[in-house]
Each structure stands twice: as structure tokens, then as C-alpha cells.
Amino acid sequence: MSLVPVVVEQTNRGERSYDIYSRLLKDRIIMLSEEVNDTTASLIVAQLLFLEAEDPDKDIHLYINSPGGSITSGMAIYDTMQYIKPDVSTICVGMAASMGAFLLAAGAKGKRYALPNSEVMIHQPLGGFRGQATDIGIHAERILKMKKKLNTILSDRTGKPLEQVELDTERDHFLSAEEAKEYGLIDEVIDKKK
């Protein structure tokens, strides 16, 4: 059972209560705090589009504490972040692993952050398939194409040579907040809100 806190605000019209995520959205804050899947991607894409419609010139802040998840779902979020007009600032709180790390790096350059004790993990895509040999071959080819695409984007986002990213993502590669900064996944480690 998931408990979502409620915030009560006093206005000149009386009291108004919001669930905490709706209240944060009012301040242009989106939380990715679970596995990336079709449901979370749809919610985040909708929030990004809503905030762009509200004010296309004001930054959006995406807080990430995620173990990663589906590549296609993550790419829907990534593409939307690049598509919309407002800059999307990303902030790692806790852990940004796999697709979570990819989305962290996808934030607007100069506006990608991590809290001091957060951790980032990059690796190659995971997948599995059962079936006929021909179908297994088709899926293996697809995952290799995805691996190349993800590594190319990470290389662009970090400034690291593609060969280095390919080597570093071959296995689980854990980085502290400072190491993530040195790697180019984030721009700054922050301990106080600006």
C-alpha cells in the first residue's frame, strides 16, 4: 500500500488540499522515484507537456531516485525532455541507475545535479528472450542497436569518447556524486538549494 501525503494550503478562498506530487508540480517539480516503465513514462511525459503549456520559458526540475527500467519507456521521457522548450534540470537524490542515470545525464547541460551522497550506475542494456532461433537473433540484433544508440547519446551528453563509454558500460559501473561529475553525467554536486 502506497501512502501519499496530503498538503493543506490556506488561500483567500479557504483551504485547499493537494497530494504532495500535485503540490510539487505546481512548483514545476516532477519526481521519478520508481522503476521506469510505461506507466511512469506516461505520467512524466504528461507532466512535462503540461508544464511546457503552462510556461514554456520556465525551467522544469526532474528529481530522480530510480533503479532504471524499460529502455523504450525511458526513451519516451528522454525524447520529450529534448522536444519541449523549457530546460529540464535533473537532480539525483539517492540512486540514479541504468535508465535513471541516462535520464539524469539527459538534463539541460549546466543544470544536471546530484546530492552529495547519491550514487549513479551506468551499464549496458539488459534483455532476455525465448523462442525460435530466428526470433532470438532478431531480438539480439535489436538490443545491440539499442546499446549502440544509448552509448552514443551518453557519449554526447558526457563529452566522453564513445569507446570509453562502451568500455565503462560493459558491466555495472557505480559512481559517487563526485565521480559522476568528473565523468560528465552531472555538472555539479549540490548540498544546499540555490
UniProtKB/Swiss-Prot annotation:
Enzyme nomenclature, EC number: 3.4.21.92
Pfam families: CLP_protease
Annotated active site: S98 (nucleophile), H123
Source domain of life: Bacteria
Subcellular compartments: Cytoplasm
Tagged with keyword Cytoplasm: yes
UniProt xrefs under InterPro entries: ClpP, ClpP/crotonase-like_dom_sf, ClpP/TepA, ClpP_His_AS, ClpP_Ser_AS
Biological role stated in the UniProt entry: Cleaves peptides in various proteins in a process that requires ATP hydrolysis. Has a chymotrypsin-like activity. Plays a major role in the degradation of misfolded proteins.
Subunit: Fourteen ClpP subunits assemble into 2 heptameric rings which stack back to back to give a disk-like structure with a central cavity, resembling the structure of eukaryotic proteasomes.
Entry-linked NCBIfam families: clpP (TIGR00493), PRK00277.1 (NF001368), PRK12553.1 (NF009205)
Protein name per Swiss-Prot or TrEMBL: ATP-dependent Clp protease proteolytic subunit
